[in-house]
């Protein structure tokens, strides 16, 4: 990755209220040892190791946490020190997932406490969060947070507005929690690639797209966070192809550049989808060159973030070679 000119790594250290480091609050991750709560043997600290190895190479290390997801469908057993085991009343279940209820202030405080602990004990360059806030909608299902809404509505009469309010409170609290410990540590987010589909009569900025929406479906008002200065960088996941009928890459990067270019903006790239999609003008080539050309022609965009690193290391579609010889040949 260093040879490809990559200057920062987002390393996921908390996927489901667990830890890829020794945490005083949450259990070791099953993704590390095979069983949640079981420490690695021989013992090691993956986060500390990643920080050391990245910094030796002049690369930043951002600790990537998933804030509200507490259990995925694949997890069959929870450790005794898992937050859900201790306080099941603070969670709701949705489509096989357990999630911290964002409407509860004790949950927002707790997650910020986790991030502050990482920042305090480790020399991380940033705290990073991706696109998981309220759950992605599933047809025929409703989020079971009505009881929380009734008791914590704070005078907000619309449940959608209330959910966005909860996320706004959380993002401000997370920003402040990090700043209170180490003001130089960055706080970044990588939201879903569509903020809002343009709609007649709507005063909410929207792109010419027809897909799931941050604002309406995930209750993530990303533009508000950016305008408030709560996030230091923004990496919208624009994983679609140029020419995609519902979510065109070109349309979306231009939209984000226009509306979110006032803060550091990087484009989330799906390496595998990029190299598998044919260039619209030259079908013998993939879309890597066209995508880089489009984004580098927009003043508000400062670079790319690649999903995911293994595809780069495998040099799928000669992506790594192109980075080394062309796009990242010089800093």
What is each residue range found by the language model?
Residues 8-11, 15-66, 72, 151-181, ...:
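Aromatic-lined substrate-binding rim segments of carbohydrate-active enzymes
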Residues 19-34, 69-95, 131-154, 200-212:
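Aromatic- and acidic-residue-enriched segments that line the glycan-binding/catalytic groove
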Residues 219-245, 260-331:
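Substrate-binding cleft of secreted/luminal carbohydrate-active enzymes
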Residues 55, 60-72, 128-132, 160-215, ...:
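Aromatic-lined carbohydrate-recognition surfaces of secreted/lumenal glycan-active proteins
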Residues 1-19, 121-126, 224, 228-234, ...:
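Catalytic domains of carbohydrate-active enzymes, especially glycoside hydrolases
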Residues 47-52, 63-121, 216-220:
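Active-site-adjacent "subsite" loops/lids of carbohydrate-active enzymes
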Residues 125, 130, 147-157, 207-208, ...:
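Aromatic- and acid-rich polysaccharide-binding/catalytic face
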Residues 26-44, 94-112, 155-167, 210-211, ...:
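The substrate-binding groove and active-site-proximal loops of carbohydrate-active enzymes
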């Amino acid at each position: 990755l260093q040879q490809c000119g990559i200057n920062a790594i987002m390393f996921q250290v908390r996927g489901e209220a667990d830890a890829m480091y020794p945490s005083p609050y949450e259990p070791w991750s099953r993704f590390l040892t095979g069983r949640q709560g079981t420490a690695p043997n021989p013992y090691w600290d993956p986060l500390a190791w990643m920080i050391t190895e990245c910094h030796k190479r002049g690369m930043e290390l951002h600790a990537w946490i998933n804030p509200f997801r507490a259990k995925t469908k694949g997890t069959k057993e929870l450790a005794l020190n898992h937050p859900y085991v201790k306080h099941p009343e603070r969670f709701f279940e949705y489509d096989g997932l357990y999630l911290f209820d964002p409407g509860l202030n004790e949950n927002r405080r707790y997650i910020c406490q986790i991030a502050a602990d990482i920042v305090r004990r480790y020399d991380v360059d940033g705290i990073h969060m991706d696109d998981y806030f309220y759950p992605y909608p599933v047809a025929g299902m409703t989020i079971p947070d009505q009881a929380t809404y009734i008791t914590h509505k704070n005078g907000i009469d619309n449940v959608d507005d209330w959910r966005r309010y909860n996320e706004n409170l959380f993002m401000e609290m997370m920003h402040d929690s990090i700043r209170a410990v180490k003001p130089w540590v960055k706080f970044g987010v990588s939201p879903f690639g569509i903020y809002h589909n343009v709609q007649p009569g709507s005063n909410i900025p929207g792109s010419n797209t027809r897909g799931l929406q941050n604002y309406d479906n995930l209750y993530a008002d990303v533009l508000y966070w950016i305008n408030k200065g709560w996030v230091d960088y923004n990496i919208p996941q624009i994983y679609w192809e140029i020419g995609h009928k519902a979510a065109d890459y070109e349309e979306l990067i231009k939209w984000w550049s226009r509306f979110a270019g006032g803060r550091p903006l990087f484009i989330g790239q799906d390496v595998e989808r990029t190299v598998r999609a044919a260039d619209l003008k030259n079908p013998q080539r993939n879309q890597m060159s066209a995508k880089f050309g489009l984004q580098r022609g927009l003043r508000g965009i400062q670079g790319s973030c690649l999903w995911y690193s293994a595809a780069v290391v495998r040099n799928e579609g000669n992506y790594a070679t192109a980075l080394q010889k062309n796009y990242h040949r010089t800093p």
